[in-house]
Amino acid sequence: MRVSGSNAFLKNSLFLKNRCGASYGGGAVCAYGDSELRVENCSFVENEGAAGGAIGVNATAKNPSPRVYIANSTFANNIADDRGGAIYMQTATTVDVFSPVIVNCTFVGNLGSNGGALCVWSRSATTMKPTFVNNLFAENYSNTWMDDESRFDIVAFYMAGQVDANNQPLPQTVLPVCKNNLYVAASDGFFADGSNKAVNFDSDVIFAATEQNPWDGGDVSYNHQTSV
């Protein structure tokens, strides 16, 4: 399903074993450009796509950002050939801030080259403000070398911003709001990349383990952490 310049409201639906063979777009759903995608009480299972195993969201330059709200849904065993095992979202030089919202969702067993569950990527200096609240992440795997089954990392998120000509990160372009997300393993990482070095989550993050998950680089800070 491709949503472009229109609105799609998906409720109480199952998306099973869909595949997108294009170079972009999610295995089940692709929201493109000035559009609205609202997903509630849906299940995305064993879908496969190039960017976003289940859902891919692509902003386009000089247009309003897509409006995305995903709630109370399950993403299980989806595979992305590239970024975002379950969901991939990217912004461009849009005329407004891209602010997708994902709440009360479960991500389990998804696989992508960058971000086993989610990849959020700002391809321009335009600010991106994703919100993630009350989500569960378990056994989502990131494998940059998709042809090598021995190289897997448990990485839930991959968030990266635009870099300059010298491959240095520009000022913060991805500003996530993360609260009360539950990680089954402490190694369910937030990041696999340090393109935005100064990201401050300033959120309540709960880990179902005895130690904080690792960080590969950058100067991330967390507040109000709880381990159970």
What would you call each of these model-derived segments?
Residues 1-51, 63:
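Right-handed parallel beta-helix
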Residues 31, 36-48, 56-228:
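Predominantly extracellular beta-rich ligand-binding scaffolds that present long acidic/polar faces
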